[in-house]
Amino acid sequence: MGLILDSSVLVTAERQGQNARQMLTSVAQRVSETEIAISVVTLIELAHGAARANTSERKAKRQKFIEELQTAMPIHPVTVPVALRAGKIDGENRARGVQVALPDLLIGVTALELGYSVGTSNLRDFQRVPGLTVVRL
């Protein structure tokens, strides 16, 4: 089984001064999953954060972290089955008055489609994705 990391885990690691490989080693020591990966949506969130950095030093540090991630672990795309399943879950959730942020929903459904769990420090949204196993990191 595998684990898709949410951006919350990556942002925390980057802020603590870890590079991508150190973060991956740290996570691997805490979980038993055979593959640790991210969704392309997480890459979008990280790129957004780098673009919004308030100093050129912070921007460069974040961009370096993003570059390292691209060679440190698999990055899974949003596929047509992921998009359709996410749309179905979003519609059903909203009909019940439950809302999940679209990036988190796409990350969660990517994990579901792969038979993986999601590793995050943001349990709230991911616990609203039916059938998803969420691991607190």
Regions found by a protein language model. Name each.
Residues 5-6, 39, 100-101, 122:
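Histidine- and aromatic-rich ligand-binding microenvironments
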Residues 48-51, 72-119:
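Active-site neighborhoods of divalent-metal-dependent phosphate/nucleic-acid chemistry enzymes
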Residues 39-41, 78-80, 121, 137:
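Conserved beta-strand termini and adjacent loop/short-helix elements that scaffold enzyme active sites
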Residues 12-14, 23, 49, 86, ...:
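Residues that scaffold the ATP/ADP-binding catalytic core of kinase and kinase-like folds
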Residues 1-2, 108-137:
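Acidic, PIN/NYN-like endoribonuclease modules and their adjacent C-terminal/linker elements
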Residues 8, 47, 64, 105-106, ...:
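Active-site phosphate/pyrophosphate-handling residues
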Residues 1-38, 51-67:
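Short, well-structured N-terminal submotif of metal-dependent ribonuclease cores
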Residues 10, 43-46, 83, 126:
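A generic structural signal for short hydrophobic patches within well-formed alpha-helices
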